[in-house]
Regions:
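Short, well-ordered beta-to-alpha junction loops that form the rim of enzyme active sites
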Residues: 10, 45-48, 96, 127, ...
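Active-site-adjacent alpha-helix immediately C-terminal to a catalytic or transition-state-stabilizing loop
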Residues: 4, 52-53, 59-67, 148-209
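Short, active-site-adjacent cap segments at secondary-structure transitions
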Residues: 13, 50-52, 99-100, 172-174
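Short, function-defining helix-loop hinge/capping sites that tune catalysis or transport
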Residues: 16-17, 103, 177
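Active-site rim beta-loop-alpha module in soluble metabolic enzymes
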Residues: 130
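Active-site-proximal alpha-helix that buttresses catalytic centers in soluble enzyme cores
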Residues: 2-82, 86, 116, 120-123, ...
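Conserved beta-strand termini and adjacent loop/short-helix elements that scaffold enzyme active sites
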Residues: 7, 94-96, 211-213
Length: 214
């Protein structure tokens, strides 16, 4: 039996300004609320700085430190952690857990975007499952890249009995919720997760049970 903890990153400056952020690397605002102490053995997140910063904020409550690891490229090849003691927790970083790419909408204020493209069109881009903004991704695209990664790596760790923390963005979190809770394509567009929102599941023999919703 293991636990899955799903945490959405804390609020960034662009979130405050109501901008489409997507893959733009924007840092967090000052975290001014109490972060719960979480029990986990391994962490997965994206390379976006707002997610990495959230991971570091969570580790402020831990007596171990994070070691960031990568799945490909020079960062993977150069990594040698064999000589480290056991006082650390691995944090695996992958673009598969990135936020939805909003294409030409990235950086635009949402009110300005509605004036430029029309309120109805922007609403459909944001709240449909398959529609794609110019140069961007749909929620379905996020599901297609996040779910195979989740099944290959994260669920494997859960099956081995490890407690896993995922620090995700809104749409990568929704992709995981869709898989874990078996949410339909139609219903997932109505699922919301606030900044700093946290879900905790029990994983036992391939079955997920929601324990806590913070």
């Amino acid at each position: 039996m293991a636990k899955l903890i799903l945490l959405r990153h804390f609020k960034s400056q662009w979130n405050l300004e109501n901008r489409f952020t997507g893959w733009v690397d924007v840092s967090l605002m000052k975290v001014d609320f109490e972060i719960p102490t979480l029990d986990f053995d391994i962490v997965y997140t994206s390379p976006l700085i707002r997610n990495l910063h959230t991971v570091l904020e969570v580790f402020e409550k831990k007596d171990k430190y994070p070691i960031f690891r990568h799945f490909k490229g020079k960062m993977k090849n150069w990594a040698h952690f064999e000589e480290l003691n056991q006082n650390y927790i691995p944090v695996f970083v992958s673009e598969a857990l990135n936020e939805r790419h909003y294409g030409k909408l990235q950086g635009l204020n949402k009110e300005e975007t509605m004036k430029k493209y029309g309120k109805k069109k922007v609403h459909l881009w944001r709240r449909s499952y398959n529609l794609v903004p110019p140069g961007g991704e749909s929620l379905a695209d996020v599901v297609k890249r996040a779910t195979p990664f989740y099944k290959k790596y994260i669920e494997k760790d859960l099956r081995s009995g490890k407690n896993v923390l995922i620090v995700a963005s809104h749409n990568s979190a929704r992709a995981i919720i869709k898989y874990v809770e078996k949410v339909s394509d139609r219903d997932i567009i109505n699922v919301e997760m606030p900044f700093g929102g946290l879900l905790q599941y029990e994983f036992n023999k391939g079955i997920y049970k929601l324990l806590k919703n913070f």
